[in-house]
């Protein structure tokens, strides 16, 4: 994104401070004013400055609170993708290899880090990649002599049970080393660094453990558990000492030019280090930031310190807002003399404030000006002027559903059992937050109930246990009810309110959002008519739900998706076998082509068979040229179809006149052959003549293709791709991978059946006709153009973004009443039942791994697209929610956060688009 004038001015001011020797600056712009855009501009200007002083390398380190934000924001800092390090490889202890890899490739590098993965060495044993690389360097350096195999066993840990899996990590890291242009020089330097940084005591301890492993080698299991030889804590401590050693080495090599600390108040320990704290994290932070006078440091935070102190904080002797402010300033003003001067000026200002007199303010004003001048040398802040542009009076609050008896029943059920078993009280906040608690919660109170059911506290008779479980009908989901698509019992007012909102329920219901596969575009190119489900749902928005409870996103993701399926299912009169019951579908659906052209490998009947798939994914240039939205903007769809049909008919009549080919009904294969022939004719190429020319009904299909075929629309949207062959191929592959797969999903097929219920003439062989009509009704061209504009991407980048916008239908387990009852018998069920997730998604996995980082990115990309999911429930707050805004103008707080800073915010992009109107004379009004 291009910086606005005030953002450009702020960035210029920051770099000017850097040039003058103020190497630590705080950017404290108000929330929503684009601190990341300012940071991007600072990155660009600092890079230009480094070039001016002939600095050949430019290294930027980006530190934020978690891996999700790192992935979200690194792409916005203006450094090319190939010069950015993946957050999964952003471990401080691995940077020595990354720096060697990029040395020969580029002189610009962006390295993302998080406090948990880079500075808190003691929190775990590191990643497998991290341990594998450390082992290989130690082996190459000969640090542990002949104990190579034993050291490998030690570094593997029991997390990697299979030796083959560990071997893969070793081979991958060795491959990275082998690819270095100066492999020998790198290994030589690392040997020298290890000799300087690895203490003799550590080497001695490692060798001692290796000797033990060698002595008892035959007794050790294959899963790498050391058993009685070494406790896990001892093994972890030893590995972490090695990790710390490599982190120190990387730190010495890193020497970044610019360090950006985003929302640093979430990890203030990095800048507020106690001199008596000798932990590994404190020592690394001190070397990286406190003792580093060369790197420029940019702190980003709208709330760098608390604006006030509460009475409780003062009573308990906790840090006050003044202490927090002074700690931040002590970091920013890092010269001793400068720091003393700032404290003197601020104390004088505070003293004058306390002695304020109405008859003489000149001394106070002079003191205030001096204090402001001192602050201005170390921080920048821009605030939004409230001129009434944002009118919150028009904001509509959700009306909460009335409590039903079932809402209270679930609490009574659980509290009654806990009281009888003497295991305490059930938290009422849980009951308010989620329904079917025994099916979804994973908290200690659930463990208490499970223990009581198992007879761990008191012996329990099986018949009493079965009766107790039976007496909790409001606390469990029943698999049998789910399988029959029964309505969910009204057990939670919050969930019912959410359903009313997102499914537009009520007596005056006009739209059916459960039938949508994408959000209706804000600027539709034509009027599709009242029959269009997209017209009925005009103005529909995605919904972002924040909750402090981990179970809530799982509840919302599963039950909202189930409710969407149920609402669709009840609209289908003639159900196929797979639509009659919920669990008729396999829990894991594979959409790849199998030998049967109508079925995939698991026997699931696909909506689009192979010939239809090829037709839907074919970007016909001939058809693309027949429709241009500007020509028909704002007109009725039926009139546009009439005009386009005549244009196509004229071309077909010309072919008939020249070749004498007769008309007849065409299938998908024949239509595809016709389009290939017509496209070749445009280029003056010779192609085999089609067997027949299209009938009048087929002309209608071609008209819908010209207006809204996904492949044709993509071809038009890729008008910035100059290579015509590449443009066609990008449109074809993108459509095949993304949109054909979308229509082939079970929930999409049910939607097609529901939408076209009662309409005649749609045989299984012509499902492609339904796709084209559905896309025309949904203003597909307008939707895809809006998405491209919102992303700001072009060509291959846009295609990649589309492919990343689709979440595969997944499923999450729940504990059904049947499963729970069976778990206490001698015949427990092998696997808990699962619920499909597609209409809504959850964003709640707090563990950091390559897999969860990828999932976080997938969820974010999908929710920030016009496609499903339409509801996202997340435990993230504050900054993590800021980027979920392109198609969402609704924010729901399931539980209000304690800190106002954590109230969810969204950019008003979608709301603004909805309020833009174009008058008949072309004037744009808001």
Regions found by a protein language model. Name each.
Residues 1-887, 897-926:
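Helicase motor interdomain insertion/brace
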Residues 891-895:
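Short hydrophobic/aromatic-enriched beta-strand-loop microsegments
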